[in-house]
A protein has these predicted regions:
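Active-site activation/catalytic loop segments of kinase-like enzymes and analogous catalytic loops
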Residues: 109, 281, 287-324, 340-363, ...
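Glycine- and acidic
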Residues: 93-96, 152-157, 277, 293-301
């Protein structure tokens, strides 16, 4: 096991929620780190007394802004009695990058406090933990979803109109599950960020500006970007700031949103149902952020031009059928919310690096086209 270097703790995480297992007195590993059986067994023993991992094999490693390891573990009798499976997925930030955001501690809290209260399908979590020193270090140990026999989504998969409609029914189930619920108020869940009220949201363009600049050097990206954006790339920053102000001023019921709602953050079960699997940007928010991001990103440009409004109406019907109340009318969603939230997708994908795991060029084409078709820039003062 490689030990991470020790460094002074920077206060990244302002929600100093006490760690769930106070018996763990050492910090979670960070920086470049490779777990082994001894480390995993010691960690899991905080929740499952007597558990030991006799051996552990790393089956697959995904390393981007988040580190995900599929592992095969041989547990002792205590582990088997606790129901721990052989195949697991460990997720944390051991990439050596992105240490200035709170996404890993937040995801751990989502799994510890909230996902079992959602009506939508989520991955089984066997362990979730975080440091409460402001460092935002977090770790989760999930089931290996490969064992469910489905497949992981990818941002460029062609789901088609029917596939997107099916996914929107699943998304409505997610949003309606804790719609306007007392469980997600600031008083009941002070650890839960409100959409567009935290730096990872409202400063996202500025945080990601380095990668936005890298894409601006790419001739393939420049070939599909609007000239007005290439002439003044800071337009995305100004427009996005106005989206932030618009959302903060809007008054409507809150729900739980995924926050980064594209096909690449889903797992498709054998029965076709979508499972929402990445909670690093989970929020108390309104559904239009998820809805716009998913539909514009999942549909081809021509599919969107012909079917977008009908799919939005379908989602709204599903949302109400699942129990949501005081839902704004379709015209307001279509004319006021969707065009503005396209800017969220534009700023997200202009900063995407393909080596993080999602192919950004088709997404940039789709969101840029939607921005022009729906007058998103104009609505946001650009």
């Amino acid at each position: 096991m490689s030990e991470p270097a020790t460094a002074p703790v920077s206060v990244i995480d302002r929600n100093l929620v006490p760690r769930p297992y106070p018996a763990r007195t050492t910090s979670l590993p960070h920086g470049r780190f490779t777990p082994d059986a001894q480390w995993l067994g010691s960690l899991m023993a905080y929740k499952y007394p007597g558990v030991e991992a006799k051996s552990m094999e790393v089956v697959q490693l995904f390393d981007s802004h988040t580190t995900k390891l599929r592992v095969a573990v041989d547990w002792n009798e205590a582990g088997l009695a606790a129901g721990l499976p052989r195949n697991l997925c460990i997720k944390s930030n051991w990439s050596g990058m992105f240490s200035d955001v709170d996404i890993h501690a937040l995801e751990a809290r989502f799994y510890h406090f909230l996902t079992d209260k959602l009506s939508a399908n989520t991955a089984t979590c066997y362990y979730a933990d975080w440091d409460d020193d402001g460092s935002a270090h977090g770790v989760i140990v999930l089931e290996d979803l490969i064992d469910r026999g489905g497949e992981f989504g990818h941002s460029t998969q062609h789901a088609g109109i029917d596939g997107v409609a099916s996914a929107l029914a699943d998304l409505a189930k997610l949003h309606a599950g804790l719609w306007d619920s007392p469980l997600i108020t600031a008083e009941a869940a002070p650890w839960l960020p409100t959409s567009m009220h935290v730096p990872v949201d409202h400063d996202q363009v500025r945080i990601m500006w380095h990668w936005i600049g890298e894409n601006l050097k790419d001739p393939n990206f420049r070939a599909i970007a609007p000239k007005h954006y290439l002439d003044d790339a800071r337009r995305v920053e100004r427009a996005y700031d106005r989206l932030v102000a618009f959302e903060r001023a809007f008054d409507a019921p809150y729900c739980i949103i995924l926050g980064d709602c594209h096909q690449g953050n889903t797992y498709i079960l054998p029965n076709g149902e979508r499972m929402w699997v990445d909670w690093q940007l989970g929020r108390r928010g309104r559904p239009w952020r998820d809805l716009t991001y998913f539909t514009v990103g999942s549909l081809t440009i021509e599919e969107r031009r012909h079917h977008h409004r009908d799919l939005i109406a379908h989602y709204r019907d599903c949302l109400i059928r699942e129990g949501a109340t005081n839902v704004i009318d379709l015209d307001t969603i279509w004319n006021e919310q969707i065009p503005r939230w396209v800017m969220y997708g534009i700023q997200a994908w202009v900063a995407n690096m393909d080596h993080w795991g999602q192919n950004g060029l088709p997404m940039n084409e789709r969101f840029f086209a939607a921005g022009e078709d729906l007058s998103s820039w104009k609505l946001l003062g650009e």
